[in-house]
Amino acid sequence: MSIRVSVADPSEQETWNRYVDRSPQGTVFHRYEALECLRNHSGATLYPLVGYKGNHPVGIFPVFELNSGPFSLVFSPPYELGIPNLGPALLDMDQMKQRKQEKRHLRFFESCLEWIDEEIDPQYTYVETDWHYEDARPFAWNDFDVSPAYTYVIPLADRPDEEELIGRFSQNPRRLIRDAQDRDYSVDVGDRDDVAWITQSVIDRYEEQDRTPHLSVDFVTELYDRLPEGTVRPLVLSLDGERVTGNILTDTGDRIRHWQGGARVDMDLPANELVEWHGMLNAIERDVPIYELVGANTRRITTWKAKFSPETRTYYSAKRSTMSMEMAESLYVNLRDSSELLSRLSPATN
């Protein structure tokens, strides 16, 4: 039996979100409310694709169409919003034997691809999967250029206490965190205003480095407003009653991710080390088994993250383009053209 692909509409939001919750690859950003936020702030058209075998759902694949002049571009996730991963999320395949699982997976993916080609006919397609999406062969078998990318996770299922957790870090953060315990600082879960403040701090840091920010305050606060309470959670470190730094965490119940934040602080308090440690303690308190330090692809940044002794996980970026778009991208690389179209072609991850 073939896989039938349809587009979920807003009336099916609850059903879609149940699929997200059931899928090992489902993330905060797969939720229907989050997808609508991505649509609102990317200027893209959203297609939440659902694959069915008969009446049984086998997977979801949210994609976004962007148009620049004569070109149609498809992204999952859309670029320039700081979203680390999206892509396909599979349903009810873990209990299948390997042969049947691979067959169902491939048919679902190729049916979605057929829908995309028939309805959008893009010249360029770019997908970044979640690290739970372990088999990227369907992309490679359908003419995508597939590349591995990396992120860091810290397993916390054994629920270490504060000192046990510190003891797992390298020498430098162990010393810094222990030495800071007599300082008058606090780390607390914040509110919407703190979400906006942390986001603006990240934006300011990008601009100080002459880099283009990949998110906006309006986008992140809309996510905070629309997703279930506690899904987007600001963690704020204050010293003597004044905000110093903070992280924006996302929480799916089985994984907490440090998504945004951690702008450099010029002071003698190890503020970012402390707020990261408290983020992990927050995960332990909520009985969440994984804390993710999103992104392990930039050497300068990994040097800082690695001192918390994380484990690496692999996810995949997959790109497919027509000959004309390959020529345009090659021209961009050679000339460093900063046009709006070409700046979208290679989403960057930390």
Region roles according to the model:
Residues Y79, P213, A263, S317-R320:
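Short, acidic/turn-prone active-site loops that include or flank metal/cofactor-
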Residues G69-F144, G253-P310:
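Acyl-donor binding region in acyl/amide transferases
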Residues R22, E119, R183, G230, ...:
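Structured helix-beta-strand junction loops
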Residues E65, H132, A140-E163, R286-N350:
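Active-site/acyl-donor-binding loops of N-acyltransferases
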Residues N172-R175, I198-S201, R233, N282, ...:
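A general structural signal for short secondary-structure boundary/capping elements
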Residues I3-P70, D130-T151, A157-R159, E164-D268:
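A conserved beta-strand-loop-helix scaffold within acyl/acetyltransferase catalytic domains
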